[in-house]
């Protein structure tokens, strides 16, 4: 039987995912990182319209669930060592697959900028694929299916890392 802490963590994870699911379909007004709701995500992290907002969206979802962290608009900042449990090829290893939980944050590495440049929430994992909820994807919030080979890092902000 799961401990009280494990049950509370599971409930919180589902709350974050539920909040994110309600945002699916939110679109930018003009395709320039703008629009009423997009600007709300950005304001939550201290920015105004016109900035990339994938990290702001993730932070906003956590905030709506009552969590004070993460609250950062810069994607790489969501992956401190203490919270990150896989990087690079390690994310596809069998031991890591059992660690991935709903509301963990995934990061995609951008070769051109040589850092994580896109993030989102993990809804669940099916085989070697993550089902995700991401902001600033095709100018909107959407759910996607991503192969683990495309994932550079995974961080846990609810369970405190592993």
Question: Locations of the language-model features?
Answer:
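Short, surface-exposed, charged/polar-biased interaction segments
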Residues: 40-44, 79-83, 141-143, 153
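Helix N-terminus capping/helix-initiation residues
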Residues: 34-35, 74, 147
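Secondary-structure boundary/capping motif
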Residues: 57, 102, 118, 124, ...
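N-terminal capping segments
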Residues: 1-67
């Amino acid at each position: 039987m799961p401990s009280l802490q494990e049950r509370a963590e599971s409930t919180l994870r589902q709350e974050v995912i539920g909040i994110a699911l309600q945002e699916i379909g939110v679109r930018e007004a003009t395709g320039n990182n703008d629009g009423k709701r997009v600007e709300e995500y950005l304001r939550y992290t201290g920015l105004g319209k016109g900035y990339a907002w994938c990290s702001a969206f993730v932070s906003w979802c956590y905030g709506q669930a009552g969590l004070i962290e993460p609250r950062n608009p810069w994607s790489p900042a969501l992956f401190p060592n203490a919270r990150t449990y896989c990087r690079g090829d390690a994310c596809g290893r069998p031991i890591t697959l059992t660690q991935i939980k709903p509301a963990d944050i995934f990061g995609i590495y951008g070769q051109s900028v040589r850092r994580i440049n896109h993030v989102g929430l993990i809804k669940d994992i099916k085989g070697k694929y993550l089902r995700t909820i991401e902001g600033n994807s095709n100018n909107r919030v959407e759910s996607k299916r991503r192969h683990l080979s495309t994932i550079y890092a995974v961080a846990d902000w609810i369970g405190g890392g592993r």
